């Protein structure tokens, strides 16, 4: 196996005292494309959120590039792992490009505005996901599948070595479902 990007050791997760996944251990190497399958409610999204640090773990260890997740700041972790959540609500007033630009925030200081380079990168990611023509369109006016592809462009604009895609094909027709998996295969290389 190549260099370990993610190591999960004896991880138990759940809500309160209710354990959803117990004693999970696995390692993912650089360039690997991994899918998590299971029944509805089995804990797949909970696992991703816990590994990403969005939910507390009950026990165990999560390492990114050999470093414990707890040693990362939120900003530093956002430079390592981009996460496309299963359900994302987008408020009024945001355009497609606004959403994609949010992927650049881990690289900006609080006083900085996005650079021309950031804007170019965002548009390139929108081009890659077939959403470039939606850059100036309010996200409230696009279809569910178009919104999903805009959100994929956002995680790509984050330029992280690790992507968590939680049900990335939700709301997409068959053609775009195949495209998402093609993107994932290309990105894993």
Enumerate the predicted regions with their spans:
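Conserved structural motif at the start of ABC-family nucleotide-binding domains
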Residues: 6, 21-22
